[in-house]
Amino acid sequence: MQIFVKTLTGKTITLEVEASDTIENVKAKIQDKEGIPPDQQRLIFAGKQLEDGRTLSDYNIQKESTLHLVLRLRGGMQIFVKTLTGKTITLEVEASDTIENVKAKIQDKEGIPPDQQRLIFAGKQLEDGRTLSDYNIQKESTLHLVLRLRGGMQIFVKTLTGKTITLEVEASDTIENVKAKIQDKEGIPPDQQRLIFAGKQLEDGRTLSDYNIQKESTLHLVLRLRGGMQIFVKTLTGKTITLEVEASDTIENVKAKIQDKEGIPPDQQRLIFAGKQLEDGRTLSDYNIQKESTLHLVLRLRGGMQIFVKTLTGKTITLEVEASDTIENVKAKIQDKEGIPPDQQRLIFAGKQLEDGRTLSDYNIQKESTLHLVLRLRGGMQIFVKTLIGKTITLEVEASDTIENVKAKIQDKEGIPPDQQRLIFAGKQLEDGRTLSDYNIQKESTLHLVLRLRGGMQIFVKTLTGKTITLEVEASDTIENVKAKIQDKEGIPPDQQRLIFAGKQLEDGRTLSDYNIQKESTLHLVLRLRGGMQIFVKTLTGKTITLEVEASDTIENVKAKIQDKEGIPPDQQRLIFAGKQLEDGRTLSDYNIQKESTLHLVLRLRGGMQIFVKTLTGKTITLEVEASDTIENVKAKIQDKEGIPPDQQRLIFAGKQLEDGRTLSDYNIQKESTLHLVLRLRGGMQIFVKTLTGKTITLEVEASDTIENVKAKIQDKEGIPPDQQRLIFAGKQLEDGRTLSDYNIQKESTLHLVLRLRGGMQIFVKTLTGKTITLEVEASDTIENVKAKIQDKEGIPPDQQRLIFAGKQLEDGRTLSDYNIQKESTLHLVLRLRGGDI
């Protein structure tokens, strides 16, 4: 039979094998084809490293299966593993080792079975099938080992044939783990399994607890039939595309396949079948789409149009829509803006009530048309109840209803017994005997429903004095509840308590399970000193808001206070201090924000924009970003999509390498711009740096290192500050922002180091408007360097600058001393208008 072997570079090799071949035989065939010695090959299948002495059939590897080939880098490295008892274990590993391999090494040393081990790094639980390099674990990193207490829980998996399988799992198991357990029991490859719970298809990377799957829950197993079927997609130009699909594929999957074939981003695709627009989350079988069915592809034109919606109060809302949007879509947009549930909205145009399933173009609604919004009034009022799985329930209630009554209504709708319900509003747990009006719950308020897990557990709270308190809690308890229990035991008011777990401050409205706090976990209690402080928040409209805060408040807490005062949702807020965007998880003291400091509030406009990232393999990734995102944020989004660690990414735009701390708008990157992604190759090379005294320094570098990085390495070795270093190669002065590969500097190349004498000089640059700029320069600076300094001061790109001195236009590669430009000389700056000069 044939199998495929995929390398990390994306290359796929085809091998002729037999099911009885050993892994050793397969590696020999790879050596014959690719020249890679077997001892440098590691083969992975279904997230598991394959052992030499086993056969393909031992691993249920069938025809057209794909193995993954990872190369062992010679040499390896040491890492440390710290247990909860404080013991530290040293392991010899390679960056390409999987977490599973690491657990096996721990078992060899400590005798702990892998299925009882949980490894934590940088606060994240590590998954068996991933490698150390996937998590950027480097030499001498420390992992933390937490033991899984035996027991977990049992769940059931029911197949379409009616057979029920029992599995031993833990709430923290991923769906991928569950599929692997099903494979172990039933031999069904994970890629042929679809798991359904509460009517929802479960995603591989999520955990059982993400879906609120509890002990003795039943999942449904649907098999993906191999081979699937063909369908056709017809475009408006008449072109027909053939796709290989399965009836269980979602519309989202189909759009991704169309993107692979045609390069059309999914958000620009609308698929129509039997006159109906298909929704992303539904499957082909939901729409009864069978083999050789034809779908119609309509492109969403970017930009669409604006329409207005006028309410009975006279308020006018502006919406971005497309003529192909359904009335249902429009109501959803109104809900996003105004919070009015679609079932309370009636839309009127030209005296006619609009029906949900029709489109704007069906009613001839064009740009800048005005719709009228009429609310359906109910008796009493409506409130919403949001569950942990994200489902929202609508209830008809009255302000005088007790919490007990509300729980009974939830039982009627959802079948959840009242004694398993906990209702939370404004971060507070609601008591049965109180009424909605006691808690100031008004129409369209949203309550949060948390289920009580039967049984509870004990946790410990350690104070700074060393005292340890034991608390009886449930995983669904909020941090606020925990603080109340501490107050009951110790008399410390909740507003003076700060609880820390895994180095993170815990927020009142979150639950213990949100932070993965399990039985016998230890929290740390730190007391807040009374008093706090005031800070100011200035908006773009010039309004200043005063907030009462503490230095230990997180940015997330501050945004919540702004929401309380101004009604602006936190996800639309960006806070700036000292020119820096503040991150949610950090505290005010992390940024040295003191009393009476002023923060600046910038609103994120909903929707942001799309940009494209093109890799060297030609693959194009689509990202949702905002102009205010930093390059660091963008690299994190690429990591989320592609798994490439940020420190291996170099992003290029307009020929320039982008710096982590700058934003997209700093580089004038706009919607639908394309960035280029270049990978930093690990391993690097040696170069030499020769000083004027004749001394030669050896440096370990990578071709992707910037000149700035190289100067930092020289500073580490020789103590010379980067701003006093000038590096020369092939007679050319090297610029900080460029890379070694930009200058074709290869292994064992020699750079020359010239020192800048301190002091330099000042020159003046006069613009046509009469403005004079002062620059700090040196006689050895090139004209290119000078233009870069002008860009830093004035924001004018170098390619739009022409510099004149003594009636002569200055050339980029020459230095100031070449033109005899001395201290306090005046240059003249003329701007090049695109397409010609002025």
UniProtKB/Swiss-Prot annotation:
GO cellular component terms, semicolon-separated: cytoplasm; nucleus
Highest taxon of source: Eukaryota
GO MF terms, alphabetically ordered: protein tag activity; ubiquitin protein ligase binding
SMART domains documented for this protein: UBQ (SM00213)
Prodomain positions: 837-838
Residue(s) of cross-link: Glycyl lysine isopeptide (Gly-Lys) (interchain with K-? in acceptor proteins): G76
CDD domains assigned: Ubl_ubiquitin
Keyword line: Cytoplasm, Isopeptide bond, Nucleus, Repeat, Ubl conjugation
Spans through the membrane: none
InterPro entries named among the record's database cross-references: Ubiquitin-like_dom, Ubiquitin-like_domsf, Ubiquitin_CS, Ubiquitin_dom, Ubiquitin_ubiquitin-like
Biological processes per GO annotation: modification-dependent protein catabolic process; programmed cell death involved in cell development; protein ubiquitination; ubiquitin-dependent protein catabolic process
Family: Belongs to the ubiquitin family.
Miscellaneous comment as given in the Swiss-Prot or TrEMBL entry: In C.elegans ubiquitin is encoded by 2 different genes. ubq-2 gene codes for a single copy of ubiquitin fused to the ribosomal proteins eL40. ubq-1 gene codes for a polyubiquitin precursor with exact head to tail repeats.
Protein name: Polyubiquitin-A
Organism: Caenorhabditis elegans
Gene: ubq-1
